[in-house]
């Protein structure tokens, strides 16, 4: 969700231990397979694959699953799927703008499942281009704070093209132009700073604040979309204050 709110951080932690863990594993494994197919199966020569593997390991995906996905993607092992990325656009409750990114081997299934989740939870689909113009593609690095200070992080990434560093309580978020993403990644590595993820994301150009009632409705829609096997990422232009995030965390 846009803004990477503290509520989102709480939701992600909760998701790691609830019944959706298997879905998250499947997403991460799918990303490994696609990265290996696009850039080759050697993590040392394919930064995207290396980061996908690191992210999967941090989420406790079994090594066997990781290795099989790498081999399927690189062609070392049979059984890989013909994945394609599809972006659906729509509006949630309260007119909240939404982008739903899918990675699927069945375009018709993905479209049907996304549309069903949207219509059953107060959302509606939109024509291509009618929502996406409200978002821009950015490079993003997420890092657990630990002993890391914002000053140390800024010192490491500013010359590499970082545009903004956001403090989300237990995490830092670094945003940059997508052309600078690999430079930021290398700057973090050179500084010995461990990161959780480095990837391309969508960020809304103008965020819309939501009260607790609207945020709950949108959260329910996001949960329904998250249950769709083909859905990889969901982006919105909704922002949630610390107070609303705290209220939702108690739900």
From Swiss-Prot:
Disulfide bonds: none annotated. It is found in: Cytoplasm. It comes from the Bacteria. One of its GO terms (cellular component) is cytosol. Pfam families: TACO1_YebC_N, Transcrip_reg. Belongs to the TACO1 family. This is Probable transcriptional regulatory protein cu0933. It comes from Corynebacterium urealyticum (strain ATCC 43042 / DSM 7109). The lineage of its organism: Bacteria, Bacillati, Actinomycetota, Actinomycetes, Mycobacteriales.
